[in-house]
Protein backbone atom coordinates (compact mmCIF):
# COMPACT_ATOMS: atom_id res chain seq x y z
CA UNK A 1 0.00 0.00 0.00
CA UNK A 2 1.24 3.50 -0.82
CA UNK A 3 0.99 6.07 1.95
CA UNK A 4 0.68 9.78 1.31
CA UNK A 5 2.49 12.52 3.26
CA UNK A 6 0.99 15.92 2.41
CA UNK A 7 3.73 17.87 4.21
CA UNK A 8 6.39 16.38 1.93
CA UNK A 9 4.30 16.07 -1.20
CA UNK A 10 2.90 19.62 -1.27
CA UNK A 11 6.00 21.36 0.08
CA UNK A 12 6.69 24.55 -1.85
CA UNK A 13 10.11 25.41 -3.20
CA UNK A 14 12.11 28.10 -1.47
CA UNK A 15 13.32 29.54 -4.78
CA UNK A 16 10.34 30.12 -7.10
CA UNK A 17 10.48 32.55 -10.00
CA UNK A 18 7.56 34.98 -10.09
CA UNK A 19 6.52 36.99 -13.14
CA UNK A 20 3.43 39.17 -13.42
CA UNK A 21 2.17 39.35 -16.99
CA UNK A 22 -0.07 42.15 -18.19
CA UNK A 23 -2.31 41.33 -21.14
CA UNK A 24 -3.94 44.69 -21.94
CA UNK A 25 -4.71 45.39 -18.28
CA UNK A 26 -5.41 41.75 -17.41
CA UNK A 27 -3.00 40.49 -14.75
CA UNK A 28 -1.77 36.89 -14.81
CA UNK A 29 0.85 35.64 -12.37
CA UNK A 30 3.28 32.93 -13.46
CA UNK A 31 5.36 31.12 -10.83
CA UNK A 32 7.96 28.63 -12.04
CA UNK A 33 9.56 25.96 -9.86
CA UNK A 34 6.44 25.98 -7.63
CA UNK A 35 6.58 22.65 -5.78
CA UNK A 36 9.78 21.29 -4.26
CA UNK A 37 8.79 17.69 -5.10
CA UNK A 38 6.71 17.84 -8.29
CA UNK A 39 7.85 14.36 -9.34
CA UNK A 40 6.08 12.85 -6.31
CA UNK A 41 2.85 14.63 -7.26
CA UNK A 42 3.19 13.62 -10.91
CA UNK A 43 3.77 9.99 -9.94
CA UNK A 44 0.64 10.08 -7.78
CA UNK A 45 -1.40 11.59 -10.62
CA UNK A 46 -0.20 9.01 -13.14
CA UNK A 47 -1.04 6.19 -10.70
CA UNK A 48 -4.60 7.40 -10.04
CA UNK A 49 -7.42 6.57 -12.45
CA UNK A 50 -9.17 9.65 -13.86
CA UNK A 51 -12.91 9.72 -14.45
CA UNK A 52 -15.48 11.45 -16.64
CA UNK A 53 -17.80 11.49 -13.59
CA UNK A 54 -17.70 15.19 -12.70
CA UNK A 55 -20.99 16.02 -10.92
CA UNK A 56 -19.56 19.20 -9.38
CA UNK A 57 -18.31 20.37 -12.79
CA UNK A 58 -20.88 19.03 -15.28
CA UNK A 59 -19.62 21.11 -18.22
CA UNK A 60 -15.98 20.06 -17.89
CA UNK A 61 -15.14 18.28 -21.17
CA UNK A 62 -12.40 15.95 -19.95
CA UNK A 63 -11.63 13.61 -17.11
CA UNK A 64 -10.47 14.57 -13.67
CA UNK A 65 -9.07 13.27 -10.41
CA UNK A 66 -10.70 14.62 -7.25
CA UNK A 67 -9.25 13.44 -3.92
CA UNK A 68 -9.37 14.88 -0.40
CA UNK A 69 -5.84 15.73 0.74
CA UNK A 70 -4.77 18.39 3.22
CA UNK A 71 -3.81 21.41 1.07
CA UNK A 72 -3.65 23.87 3.98
CA UNK A 73 0.13 24.15 3.58
CA UNK A 74 -0.54 26.16 0.40
CA UNK A 75 -2.49 28.89 2.23
CA UNK A 76 0.43 31.09 3.25
CA UNK A 77 1.86 31.11 -0.26
CA UNK A 78 -1.45 31.92 -1.97
CA UNK A 79 -2.32 34.62 0.58
CA UNK A 80 1.06 36.23 -0.02
CA UNK A 81 0.85 36.06 -3.83
CA UNK A 82 -2.75 37.30 -4.01
CA UNK A 83 -2.09 40.21 -1.65
CA UNK A 84 1.15 41.08 -3.48
CA UNK A 85 -0.18 41.02 -7.04
CA UNK A 86 -3.97 41.26 -6.73
CA UNK A 87 -6.53 42.63 -4.32
CA UNK A 88 -6.93 40.12 -1.49
CA UNK A 89 -10.68 39.73 -0.99
CA UNK A 90 -11.10 36.04 -0.26
CA UNK A 91 -10.59 33.82 2.75
CA UNK A 92 -7.74 31.70 1.39
CA UNK A 93 -7.47 29.59 4.56
CA UNK A 94 -11.17 28.71 4.45
CA UNK A 95 -11.09 27.89 0.73
CA UNK A 96 -8.02 25.67 0.86
CA UNK A 97 -9.11 23.89 4.04
CA UNK A 98 -12.09 22.55 2.05
CA UNK A 99 -10.47 22.23 -1.38
CA UNK A 100 -9.75 18.81 -2.79
CA UNK A 101 -6.73 17.80 -4.83
CA UNK A 102 -8.32 18.41 -8.22
CA UNK A 103 -6.50 17.46 -11.42
CA UNK A 104 -7.78 18.18 -14.91
CA UNK A 105 -6.98 15.36 -17.34
CA UNK A 106 -7.67 16.44 -20.90
CA UNK A 107 -6.96 15.40 -24.47
CA UNK A 108 -7.08 17.52 -27.61
CA UNK A 109 -10.16 15.80 -29.02
CA UNK A 110 -12.24 16.50 -25.90
CA UNK A 111 -11.24 20.11 -25.32
CA UNK A 112 -13.78 22.92 -25.71
CA UNK A 113 -12.23 25.70 -27.83
CA UNK A 114 -14.62 28.34 -26.45
CA UNK A 115 -13.26 30.78 -23.86
CA UNK A 116 -15.03 30.63 -20.51
CA UNK A 117 -14.94 32.06 -17.00
CA UNK A 118 -14.78 29.89 -13.90
CA UNK A 119 -16.75 32.16 -11.57
CA UNK A 120 -17.54 35.85 -11.07
CA UNK A 121 -15.28 36.20 -8.02
CA UNK A 122 -12.14 34.73 -6.52
CA UNK A 123 -9.02 33.32 -8.10
CA UNK A 124 -8.08 30.27 -10.15
CA UNK A 125 -4.73 28.53 -10.20
CA UNK A 126 -3.37 25.88 -12.56
CA UNK A 127 -0.19 23.92 -11.90
CA UNK A 128 1.21 21.86 -14.78
CA UNK A 129 2.54 18.32 -14.37
CA UNK A 130 3.44 17.42 -17.94
CA UNK A 131 7.20 16.96 -18.29
CA UNK A 132 9.13 18.97 -20.90
CA UNK A 133 8.78 16.51 -23.78
CA UNK A 134 5.00 16.29 -23.17
CA UNK A 135 4.33 20.03 -22.95
CA UNK A 136 2.47 21.72 -25.77
CA UNK A 137 0.37 24.87 -25.86
CA UNK A 138 -0.66 26.48 -22.62
CA UNK A 139 -3.48 28.72 -21.42
CA UNK A 140 -4.99 31.44 -23.62
CA UNK A 141 -6.58 34.56 -22.14
CA UNK A 142 -9.31 36.66 -23.75
CA UNK A 143 -11.16 39.93 -23.24
CA UNK A 144 -14.95 40.08 -22.84
CA UNK A 145 -15.38 40.28 -26.65
CA UNK A 146 -13.44 37.01 -27.09
CA UNK A 147 -10.36 38.70 -28.53
CA UNK A 148 -7.24 36.77 -27.59
CA UNK A 149 -4.96 38.83 -25.34
CA UNK A 150 -2.11 36.41 -24.72
CA UNK A 151 -0.89 32.92 -23.87
CA UNK A 152 0.97 31.48 -20.90
CA UNK A 153 2.98 28.52 -22.15
CA UNK A 154 2.68 25.16 -20.46
CA UNK A 155 5.77 24.21 -18.43
CA UNK A 156 6.45 21.49 -15.87
CA UNK A 157 5.87 22.66 -12.28
CA UNK A 158 4.58 26.07 -13.45
CA UNK A 159 1.76 27.69 -11.49
CA UNK A 160 -0.54 30.22 -13.17
CA UNK A 161 -2.80 32.46 -11.04
CA UNK A 162 -5.59 34.68 -12.35
CA UNK A 163 -8.99 36.02 -11.36
CA UNK A 164 -11.85 33.61 -12.04
CA UNK A 165 -13.88 36.16 -14.05
CA UNK A 166 -11.13 36.29 -16.69
CA UNK A 167 -12.01 34.47 -19.91
CA UNK A 168 -9.58 31.69 -20.75
CA UNK A 169 -9.28 28.36 -22.51
CA UNK A 170 -6.65 25.61 -22.59
CA UNK A 171 -4.55 26.04 -25.71
CA UNK A 172 -3.79 22.61 -27.13
CA UNK A 173 -2.45 22.46 -30.68
CA UNK A 174 -4.37 19.94 -32.74
CA UNK A 175 -3.19 16.40 -32.13
CA UNK A 176 -0.92 17.40 -29.25
CA UNK A 177 -2.57 15.30 -26.54
CA UNK A 178 -3.65 11.98 -28.02
CA UNK A 179 -3.33 8.28 -27.26
CA UNK A 180 -1.80 7.81 -23.82
CA UNK A 181 -0.72 11.46 -23.56
CA UNK A 182 -2.97 13.73 -21.50
CA UNK A 183 -2.71 17.36 -20.44
CA UNK A 184 -2.54 17.19 -16.65
CA UNK A 185 -2.77 20.11 -14.28
CA UNK A 186 -3.78 20.63 -10.67
CA UNK A 187 -6.60 23.14 -10.42
CA UNK A 188 -7.45 25.35 -7.44
CA UNK A 189 -10.46 27.65 -7.13
CA UNK A 190 -9.94 30.16 -4.34
CA UNK A 191 -12.97 32.20 -3.44
Walk through the language-model features, giving the residues of each.
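Non-heme Fe(II)/2-oxoglutarate
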Residues: 2-98, 110-112
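Catalytic core of non-heme Fe(II) oxygenases with the double-stranded beta-helix
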Residues: 100-191
Amino acid sequence: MKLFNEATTFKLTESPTEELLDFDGLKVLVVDNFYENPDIIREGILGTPATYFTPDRPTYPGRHIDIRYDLSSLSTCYKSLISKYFKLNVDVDECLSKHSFLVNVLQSEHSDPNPHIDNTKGYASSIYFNILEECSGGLDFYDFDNNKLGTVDMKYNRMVLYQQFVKHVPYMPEGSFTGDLHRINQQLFIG
